[in-house]
């Protein structure tokens, strides 16, 4: 959860893990303030094989197939798959009343700079169809810290760049500490 002076954001996923398969149960997203409010509620009914809910007051009702994830749980599945040594990953992600395919590939190992120091990481890129999007996203997962996402670099269609970098953190009761130069 994050909150700013004039805006708020909350994203919550409930899921189960069944033999290395993430099964979403519910997904809630709420953003308020700055004139861009958005509310999403989705429930994943595995017995009825349906995703039901609302996205910006529009009803969602789509068939649910094994392997489908919400917009938060796929990130955990990606982290899990990188930790398992997979090099090419594809996820079916429910986005409103559609199901999008998110593809990723491992680019290799790299020592990456973060606010917590230099971290040995696995570098992963989001694979997009260049005829549909020139947006680029690269992620780094820390090898020695349970594959925690420690850095993300995104270049938008308009060329604007964004970077998210780990400042501090704790994994299994230990303070995340990178190497010094």
Residues covered by each model-derived region:
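Acidic, serine/threonine-rich low-complexity disordered tracts
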Residues: 1-46, 84-181
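Hydrophobic, well-structured mid-protein blocks that either form specific transmembrane helices
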Residues: 36-81
